[in-house]
Amino acid sequence: MLTIADRSFQSHLIMGTGGASSFDTLEKSLIASGTELTTVAMRRHAAHTGAHGESVFELMQRLNITPLPNTAGCRTARDAILTAQLAREALDTSWIKVEVIADDTTLLPDVLELIDATETLTNDGFTVLAYTSDDPVVAQRLEDAGAAAVMPLGSPIGTGLGILNPHNIELICSRATVPVLLDAGIGTASDATLAMELGCSGVLLASAINRCINPITMATAMKHAVEAGRLAREAGRIPRREHAVASSSFEGLASWADEVL
């Protein structure tokens, strides 16, 4: 069970809607992934791209998926705060994924603006899920500012490079008292599994599904990958060793010398 603030979800996979090739493919991918929480970028108008003019928000309502509006594209805390307020009024939700981007080339978080936005929105009654860098100190500052979940990147958005700094992700997980959701950079199922093995509570991804060759098949793979990583973490991996350790006992082993005698 993934618990964030006052809500719980069976699935530990959060899916994004950005980059989907078609409305129909998005719908089938959402179903295949098993996600119960899905991010949508807030804009001044909602795109109606379904066959019958159905919006993404109406699709999620039909599929019983909780929408998580985000502030994608915002460059300042002020813009992120305004976008969150518009989302609350439009969607009647106080949940918001806060992104404050430093520049359009790297799409890396501006952590100073992010912390400012997180604190202000938390004080205004929002449940903030904060997209951040893989810096453990920044993650702690966001938690101190009131974030209900911290969302460190594995690698820059859309790169598919996987988790470039697993040590830092594991360190963030070990120190956090709120859920840690790996966000950005996932390229394939093994990346999602690793995130959960490192101790993440969940994984958010969009491009890895929406921009791959077969999104529906990849959505299914990601569903199982996240669950596999979670179970592996709970089971506990064997310790790493410098030397080989036999898995079978040598007691009673037949040898040629014994047979000759």
From Swiss-Prot:
Coiled coil: none annotated. Pfam families: ThiG. The keyword Lyase does not apply. GO terms for biological process: thiamine diphosphate biosynthetic process. It is found in: Cytoplasm. GO terms for cellular component: cytoplasm. Its main location: cytoplasm. Belongs to the ThiG family. This is Thiazole synthase. It comes from Corynebacterium diphtheriae (strain ATCC 700971 / NCTC 13129 / Biotype gravis). The gene is thiG.
